[in-house]
Amino acid sequence: MNRVSKMSTFLFKIGGNALSDAKDRRRFCDAVSTMIDSGTRVIIVHGGGPEINKALEMKGIQPKKVNGLRVTDKDTLDVVEGTLSSINGSLVRSLKRSGVKALGVPGYVVALCKRKEPSIVDGTAVDLMYVGDVSSVDIDAIEGLFDNGITPVIYPIGADENGDHLNINADSMASGVASALR
């Protein structure tokens, strides 16, 4: 059993829709601050679907999904990564205003990922390209943040063993991190 799991640790997965309303974001950040003040360690994993779709459309890229996963070519990945990084920075600033010592962390800092195999749709293989799943999580990296009183705020951009960045579904990133914390 790892050290993180012996302490009270709570993982929030928050979707992009929930982050778009300033009042809701403030309430969320205040609740996180209260939890931390009571001795709970908090990890936050967030998505950004609506903002990503808007950013893609502004770049003239039509968002495409297969079985709920975003088909991610290199241009799409650049937009996804930039948008998630921006959302992350905004959330971290909001948490800091609520008294939380938060740090924005791309998923590839705490997790190794692998590229997803092509999905079968109507009998045809569809390559999702730069899309992956979490294969392992670096608990020591998370513990190091906790040891310094830092709340990790993870956005779901992973990297494979070659260092290639991958778009990871936020639910999958949260699940991978939560499983590793057991």
Give the label of every model feature segment.
Residues 1-182:
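Nucleotide/pyrophosphate-binding catalytic subdomain
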